[in-house]
Amino acid sequence: FMDIFRDVCLAEYPYTPFADAFHTMRSMLLPVLYLLGSEVPVADVYHAISTGYGGLLACLGSSVHHAPVLLTEHGIYTREREEEIIRADWVVPSFKDRWIRFFYLLSEEIYRRAFRVTSLFHNARKTQIDMGCDADKCLVIPNGIQLDRFKDIPLKPDDGWVDIGAVVRLAPIKDVKTMIYAFFELHERLPKVRLHIMGSVDDEEYGAECHALVDTLGVRDLIFTGRVNVVEYMEKLDFTILTSISEGQPLSVLESLAACRPCVTTEVGCCRELLEGAPGDDFGVAGFVTPPMYRKGLADAMERMCTSRARRIEMGERGQRRVATYFLHEQMLANYRALYDET
């Protein structure tokens, strides 16, 4: 191994300290060797929920026990790792490309072996195909929710205030700071608006920074509720907002639409498809989509939503019809049962 490794270093990393190269390659390969030495339980099918190391373990089980592999990706794991590696300070710069190629190699293996590969929405399926997965293997199985929990929630009475909700963990990936800045700008334009941020603190440091930002800006009518019963709290809301910088198919948006509440979201994951419809969906627009981290765009979109109750109600009804047609819990279970039967 050391002879091979030395040759690789001389050929590809002549100006990188040997210790950096050694520990990087060790970190990359040791988990793979541990996994390949694992005893995988016997199963009728191995269903991985990501590529990467989990996908490798599913491939090992398939190879040892001669059983089919299924892959479900809620996010495109390889792309997520690529973005993380590009931004990371802990990765030796000269090894970033090798780390990225390593994760692409792992995804190629399970894409090749899998009997079927599912994603949550059409653009994710296109990404899987672009990354080398056989199009005939790829199908979309969306998330599903229990519509009955939300469909009869009454609309909030028109009391002169517009109440905006955000069902969100306080974590950097949710970009709550941009939400706070955008709401501050909105409140300067429309004084009778309130923002309810509903969710637990996922990152204590980030949560403290969000509270400090509210104090620094002097934002009024912003409520951190902590964790709440979303079904009960939805009665207090006119519409919802999501400002994440990365998502798959957010359940919070589906639940909001199921409750006849339109949404303002960033253009991440499946959000545009949820609010504007996939090909063949003619229900119409159920909210507004803005670029991530764009404060003014978010404030503008919220203002448009705030200024017309009739528009909010119409958009909410469109969203509820979309959920009732494409995103039911029962449909999701039936689709996965059919997939298991097919194997």
Language-model segments: residues:
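A short, well-ordered alpha-helix in the C-terminal region of glycosyltransferases
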Residues: S62, G297, R304, R311-Y326, ...
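Short hydrophobic beta-strand element within catalytic cores of glycosyltransferases
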Residues: P262-T265, G269-E276
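Carbohydrate-associated surface elements
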Residues: N123, G144
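Aromatic "clamp/platform" in nucleotide-sugar-dependent glycosyltransferases that forms part
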Residues: I245
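Membrane-proximal helix-turn-helix segments that form the acceptor-binding/catalytic region
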Residues: L33-V42, Y77, S94-V117
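Conserved donor-binding/catalytic core segment of Leloir-type glycosyltransferases
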Residues: P154-E185, H196
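Conserved acidic donor-binding segment of nucleotide-sugar-dependent glycosyltransferases
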Residues: G277-R295, R304-R309
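Nucleotide-activated donor-binding/catalytic signature segment of Leloir-type glycosyltransferases, i.e.
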Residues: H196, G207-R227
